[in-house]
Amino acid sequence: MTTLETLKWDGKKSGKVTLDLTVAKETSSADLIHRAVLRQLANKRQGTASTLTRSEVRGGGRKPYKQKGTGRARQGSIRTPLRPGGGIIFGPKPRSYNLDMNRKERRLALRTALMSRVSDMKAVEDFGSTLKQPKTSDIINGLARLGIQKNEKVLVILDSPSDVIKKSINNIEKVKLIAADQLNVFDILNANKLLIGQSAIDKIQEVYAS
């Protein structure tokens, strides 16, 4: 269990909130998180790369020149892998890169990753509450009030972000918005700072408790 200080949107302290999640043992946590990240990145790959072998590439039916008498190496086809425009040996073919990981392990890895970032985490009581219409500058100013530096990658975790907040954050290169029930290990570890809405903390503990 850990206790986070809660900040208001204007940057002032407003109280405290607790985050209590079960994590993996210290001896196995690194391996667990590594496998979770590897799986996530592998499953994003399209696997559509494809090349032609010598049997698939066009042409090559006739012998390019006679077997003997030219002084050159013998060739049986213009589509041999040894010639430009020839087939590819052991080139890529469409395949699936998907890796399996059972649900309990995935959730344990996510909880462990989240709790490992407690020192970089800030709880925000009313993130973007003053926004009436999409305005990127208001979000940038708000992040500065919360102690976020310009060059830091930030993951904003909210329970149910409004369209106004989504559109306001969308133009900021190093800020990513994610719903509390759609967390993933890579984004948690990739960010320099994590901003979590107070209601999102309740949602996280409800969804990922076990």
Swiss-Prot record:
Residues 60-71 have a biased composition (Basic residues). SUPFAM superfamilies: Ribosomal protein L4. One of its GO terms (biological process) is translation. Signal peptide: none annotated. One of its GO terms (molecular function) is structural constituent of ribosome. Keywords: Ribonucleoprotein, Ribosomal protein, RNA-binding, rRNA-binding. It comes from the Bacteria. Residues 46-89 are annotated as: Disordered. It holds the Pfam family Ribosomal_L4. Part of the 50S ribosomal subunit. One of the primary rRNA binding proteins, this protein initially binds near the 5'-end of the 23S rRNA. It is important during the early stages of 50S assembly. It makes multiple contacts with different domains of the 23S rRNA in the assembled 50S subunit and ribosome. Belongs to the universal ribosomal protein uL4 family. This is Large ribosomal subunit protein uL4.
